[in-house]
Amino acid sequence: MDNTSALPTRFNVRAYFILFDDAQDAVLVSDELIFGNAYTKFPGGGVEFGEGPSQTVVREAMEEMKQPIEVTGHFYTTDFYLQSFFHPADQIISIYYSARMIGEQQFTDAQIAFDFKQRIYNEESFRWVKLSTIREDMFHFAADKRVARMLATMVR
C-alpha cells in the first residue's frame, strides 16, 4: 500500500478451529448470517483480553455449538497482510487450530448450506464438508480460502 493513511490502526486477533469428523475425512464449517449477508467460514471468533487463541476456540465451540472440544495442534496462522472485511481500521491475524470433539456431538449438523431457521442476525448453521469436495470458492474470507486450499491438498 502506498497510502499509509489507509493502513489499519489496530490488530484484530481471530482464532478458528478445524474440527475433523470421526473418520477424519470431513471438516465442520459454519454458515453464518453477518450483517444480513450469508457467509461460509470455519468456526471460531475473536480473541478476548485475558485469553490465549487456543482458549478462544474452546470458548467459541461452547458458545456457538455447546460442544466441548480439545485443541490437537496448530494448523495455520495468516502469513499475509489481511485487512478486516467488516472493520477497515483493523488488520486481521487469524490462527487456525486442529481440534477434536470431546464426547458425543452436541450440535445439530445441517445437510445443506445456509440452513437457517429464522434468518435472524448472527444466525449460525453447522455442516460437515468432505475433504474430497472442499474448495476455496466455498468460503468468502481470504484466510479461510487459504485454509480450504491447504485442506484440499490433504486428500490428493
Question: Can you describe what each PLM-predicted range is?
Answer:
Residues M1-A23:
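Acidic, metal-coordinating catalytic segment for phosphate/diphosphate chemistry
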Residues M1-L7, Q83-H87, A113-F116:
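Short, P/G- and charge-enriched loop/turn segments at secondary-structure junctions
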Residues L7-F11, Y39, H87-I93, Q118-E123:
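A generic structural micro-feature
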Residues L19, S98-R100, R127-K130:
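Short, well-ordered beta-strand micro-motif
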Residues N37-T40, Q106-F107, I112-R156:
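Nudix hydrolase/Nudix homology domain
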Residues P68-T77:
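A short coil-to-beta-strand element that immediately follows conserved catalytic motifs
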Residues L82-Q111:
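Active-site-adjacent beta-strand/loop module that shapes the phosphate/pyrophosphate-binding cleft
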